[in-house]
Amino acid sequence: MRDVHGSLKYFSSVAEDMNPSDVFQIIEGHTKLMRDSIPLIASENLTSLSVRRCYVSDLGHRYAEGRVGERFYEGCKYVDQIESMAIELTRKIFEAEHANVQPISGVVANLAAFFALTNVGDTIMSISVPCGGHISHDRVSAAGLRGLRVIHYPFNSEEMSVDVDETRKVAERERPKLFILGSSLILFRQPVKEIREIADEIGAYVMYDASHVLGLIAGKAFQNPLKEGADVMTGSTHKTFFGPQRAIIASRKELAEKVDRAVFPGVVSNHHLNTLAGYVVAAMEMLEFGEDYAKQVVRNAKALAEELYSLGYKVLGEKRGFTETHQVAVDVREFGGGERVAKVLENAGIILNKNLLPWDSLEKTANPSGIRIGVQEVTRIGMKEEEMRAIAEIMDAAIKEKKSVDELRNEVKELKERFNVIKYSFDESEAYHFPDLR
């Protein structure tokens, strides 16, 4: 049996020796790691200095329960101004009839949407996790918390897309209340218009989780689900949308009251006012620079995919041009699987993640067939197609062990040191920097 009391005594003694400088030292180590690495995690990005200024403001100490003009706390007149700006910017950017900017994460936004659109016991249809779906769309996460029955779309792994004809057959039989589109692994536009038609035939809603492609939608480089028939669009604001880690919900005006009540008092109380202000600044940056940024993101992803393919890798989506987003997916089974390849690349200074692919079972989560690559962060620091080809060459050398780890790390560091300034922003500040505020 584990000695709980002994463990507590050990950690208590360690805690006595801790001080804030220990934390700062760890953060500095992490910052250096990111500065010297090539970050290709598809769900991360960098915020500008203007956005980060908001994080350390007094807003981070405050609460503002309720809606604009209808708060349960006093002292919120400036908060109301900020939230009003956030709502109007969101509506403008996404051409939305209604927007709620209070969700503090993508999963929270999805949970709110489930509360707004479904009842306990309803059936929903989503993309399975191996085919790219997010865990919050499934029984193990938000959908399960709402008490929903989850069925999965028939999926064409060669096209990396929902099979619409087969979906119609399943939908006529199962009668889902809600169709969810949008993915964690997403390479191409999804059939929103076609699913809208099916939904209308059986009286269902359509929801699109745009977390990964929100910035591409804002930059007009990807489909706008709201314009193609989605009732609700959720999305986290820190992936291709280069803002703080929080989320938005955009919807048809007829659903405004349902959405707002599902958010508060449903799943959000305080909504982190400092990052809300940061979102406003990021949205302004997106209006100013988003189109150029989004187009370059897609160009970079295509360039990386094409170079990896030319080096002999099994890049998914070949028949459709590999990708239309920030992501590239590669089948690396012949090189030991996603676990081995992700670790080898991390040792070389390239940071990405292993990923299930459509033919994998959930039992393969520990060592799936693939890796997922995202270029949105390296694009924000100014990298373009030439650098994508260089990254592919380094990846190839690491995976096939053509060079030593030290040689590879030096190549990564030499490439990265030319890119340490945030672009597509009002202030071109240092990208990887832990400020001393004393």
UniProtKB/Swiss-Prot annotation:
Pathway: Amino-acid biosynthesis; glycine biosynthesis; glycine from L-serine: step 1/1. The keyword Transferase applies. Its cofactor is pyridoxal 5'-phosphate. Its EC number is 2.1.2.-. One of its GO terms (molecular function) is glycine hydroxymethyltransferase activity. It catalyses: 5,10-methylenetetrahydromethanopterin + glycine + H2O = 5,6,7,8-tetrahydromethanopterin + L-serine. CDD domains: SHMT (cd00378). GO terms for biological process: glycine biosynthetic process from serine; tetrahydrofolate interconversion. SUPFAM superfamilies: PLP-dependent transferases (SSF53383). Keywords: Amino-acid biosynthesis, Cytoplasm, One-carbon metabolism, Pyridoxal phosphate, Transferase. The keyword Transcription does not apply. Belongs to the SHMT family. HAMAP family: SHMT. Catalyzes the reversible interconversion of serine and glycine with tetrahydromethanopterin (H4MPT) serving as the one-carbon carrier. Also exhibits a pteridine-independent aldolase activity toward beta-hydroxyamino acids, producing glycine and aldehydes, via a retro-aldol mechanism. Homodimer. This is Serine hydroxymethyltransferase.
